[in-house]
Structure formats: C-alpha cells, structure tokens
Amino acid sequence: MFNSSSLNVYFICGTQDVPEGKDIREILKQALEAGITLFQFREKGPTSLDGVEKEHLAIDLLKLCHDYQVPFIVNDDVDLAEKINADGIHVGQDDENVKSFAERFKDKIIGLSIGNEKEYYHSDLEHVDYIGVGPMFATISKNDANAPVGPSMIATLKNINPSLPMVAIGGITEDNIEPIAQNGADGVSVISAIARSHNIDKTVTKMKSYFK
C-alpha cells in the first residue's frame, strides 16, 4: 500500500537536468544518501537519451533506488516502466486515461499531475495513489509548464479530498517550502533544487524538516 510519507522529498531527474560534467548516477546516489523518499526518472528534451541507452540508465537508477529502499517511478514511458519492472508510473493530463495504466500496472504506484480544480474534477482518481499539484511557482525545468497556481491550490484540493496524498511541484526551492507545508502538502517534488544543489545533503535535510 502506498504511504503518503513517500512524497516528503520527491526527486525528479533526467540527464537533461544534470549540470555539465556531473553524472546523474552520482547525483542520485548523493540524494538517496541524503534521504530522498521517492525518485522519478524523467528523461525528456532535445539532449535526452532514448532507446537502449535510456533503458540501461533506467536500470542503473532503479538498482540504486532499491539499494536504499526508495521507490523508482518512471515519467510517462509506460513501456519502459513495464520492461524494467519499475515501482510505478507518473502521468500527465495529456496522457491516455489512468484506468488503462492501472490495468497494466496492478499493485504499482500511479501518480497524476493536476493543475487546478477543473482538472481535478475531470480526472479519473479511482486508480491514482497520489497527485502532483502545480506548478506552485514559476519554473525553469519545464518549458511547457502552465502558469503558477500557488500553494493555496493544495489547500483547495485537500478540502475537497483530505485523504488523497498530494505532492507540490514546480519552481520549488528549499527557501519557499514553508507555505506549501502550511497548506497541507504531503511533500515537495523538485528537479533543479537537488540536481543543481551545491550541498545535496543540506538541501534534502532542510526539505525533509518541513514534513516531520
């Protein structure tokens, strides 16, 4: 059964997010040692890997996560997630309906991106373990990100469905988490804040401190 505490510090990363000269495996290892609670492999963009290279990297990262008993989630790529037996899948509003994923992913974690109340009410949540709500703030990590909805969107959706685990996403740094936690989020999902941190251990520790 999915535990909402897995969302406390949710790291999302692909090779396109890693600073030049750094290796994603080493960054993930540092993040795991620092105490991240969930990892999502999101390999997207003009410089990203595909095919066999992407699959081999995914397997390396999956093994790393399992060494630390941290769930490994794949973004969007259902075929890859199935092939490597990932712990779950995260899908967006533009993807095929969630029910079809659930049928292929029995006993796996399924996450869904939701940006506002309208998307919430139009989403099939029966098979969803958690939702990613955002963007909270303006973000540089996603070129196609929508306008920020702010931390209050978490409170709005929690009022509608208090038992549904929710993780905040978009433009989050270690310095703007407090209002997110105050509005009832179960955790934060970040890309650049960890991938480009000068001290990953310190960054993750500070993030975790808001969700004790």
Curated annotation (Swiss-Prot):
Alphabetical list of SUPFAM superfamilies matching this protein: Thiamin phosphate synthase
Any Gene Ontology CC annotation: cytoplasm
Gene Ontology annotations of biological process type: thiamine biosynthetic process; thiamine diphosphate biosynthetic process
Cofactor note: Binds 1 Mg(2+) ion per subunit.
Binding site for 2-[(2R,5Z)-2-carboxy-4-methylthiazol-5(2H)-ylidene]ethyl phosphate: T139, I140, S141, G171, I191, S192
EC number from the UniProt entry: 2.5.1.3
Positions of Mg(2+) binding: D76, D95
Catalytic activity: 2-[(2R,5Z)-2-carboxy-4-methylthiazol-5(2H)-ylidene]ethyl phosphate + 4-amino-2-methyl-5-(diphosphooxymethyl)pyrimidine + 2 H(+) = thiamine phosphate + CO2 + diphosphate; 2-(2-carboxy-4-methylthiazol-5-yl)ethyl phosphate + 4-amino-2-methyl-5-(diphosphooxymethyl)pyrimidine + 2 H(+) = thiamine phosphate + CO2 + diphosphate; 4-methyl-5-(2-phosphooxyethyl)-thiazole + 4-amino-2-methyl-5-(diphosphooxymethyl)pyrimidine + H(+) = thiamine phosphate + diphosphate
Enzyme class: transferase
Pathway it works in: Cofactor biosynthesis; thiamine diphosphate biosynthesis; thiamine phosphate from 4-amino-2-methyl-5-diphosphomethylpyrimidine and 4-methyl-5-(2-phosphoethyl)-thiazole: step 1/1
Gene Ontology terms, MF aspect: magnesium ion binding; thiamine-phosphate diphosphorylase activity
Positions annotated to bind 4-amino-2-methyl-5-(diphosphooxymethyl)pyrimidine: Q40, F41, R42, E43, K44, N75, S113, K142
Entries under PANTHER family matching the protein: THIAMINE-PHOSPHATE PYROPHOSPHORYLASE (PTHR20857), THIAMINE-PHOSPHATE SYNTHASE (PTHR20857:SF15)
Protein function: Condenses 4-methyl-5-(beta-hydroxyethyl)thiazole monophosphate (THZ-P) and 2-methyl-4-amino-5-hydroxymethyl pyrimidine pyrophosphate (HMP-PP) to form thiamine monophosphate (TMP).
Name of the protein this chain belongs to: Thiamine-phosphate synthase
Source organism of the structure: Staphylococcus haemolyticus (strain JCSC1435)
Recorded name of the encoding gene: thiE
